[in-house]
Every structure is written in C-alpha cells, then in structure tokens.
Amino acid sequence: MKKLLSPLLLIFLFSNCNNTPDVIVIGHRGAMGHALENTIESVEKAIDLKVDGIEIDVFKSKSGELIVYHDPSLSRLSNSTAFIEQISLDSIKKIELIGGLSIPTLNEVIDIIPEKIFLNIELKGENTAYETNKIIIKYLSESNLTPSKFIISSFRWDELKKFR
C-alpha cells in the first residue's frame, strides 16, 4: 500500500505545478543554461520560455555605453582578457563570445523585450546608475512602456543611491 501511495502523492503534488498564476518566473541572465548568458540569444530564449521577467547585468564601457555582461573581465566567456570598463564599445563589439556570439548593449536588449515582460537590470559596475536611469527615461518617454517594466537591483549600494 505504501508503494502505491508514494507515486500517487507525487502525481498529486506535481500536477498543480502549472497552475500557479501568482508565481513570478524570472530568467536569470536571460535563459542561462539554455543559451549563453546575457546575450541576445539568451534573452530571446527566455522570451520563448514565456518568463515574466528577465534579469541581466550591466557594466559601463570606457566610451560610456552600458554593456550587458556578468563579469568585469571578458575572460570567462571569450578569448579576451580585457575589462569592460577599460575598453570602448567599438572594441567590445569586435570581441567574439563562445559560440560566435556578441556582447549586447542595454539598448539592444530593451529593444527586443516585449512590453509584457519586465526587465531586472542589475548594476554591476561603477557609474552605471546615471546611464541606466537616462536610458529608462528615454524608453518611457518614447514608447508605451511603464515604470513597472523596469526593476533596478545591485549589490552596489552607492549605485542604487545614485539611481534614486
């Protein structure tokens, strides 16, 4: 009897997994694990998986653009050992990631995300708050997007204070 109840209990417990409308599903670094993290391909995969929101990380390049990447150094996912904050967007765009993918800017990511999906932008590097705020204000004024489309997070309290 015990052997019969265990599978029935599991079936009952997991049969309701798709019926949880109040749970928010967020793709971490896009759809990390399905596509290379923080790339356009990863964000598109997260959209295909019907997430409610997507989390990405940003650093500011030497030339001032916000770059979507998790680490300060490019070494983990490319052949470059450069640090994002020390090189220009032109140089970053010439760097090839694993699988021949490229490193996107924050604008490129925002441009492909549907209105119904929110974006959690993690401020990873120094001096990212002001540029992120400026980009969000631009999108809010030029589109139908609302402030609830964007969430700002960071371990860098100084950047969060600047954002306010």
Describe the residue ranges of each PLM region.
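Sec-dependent N-terminal signal peptides
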Residues: 4-14
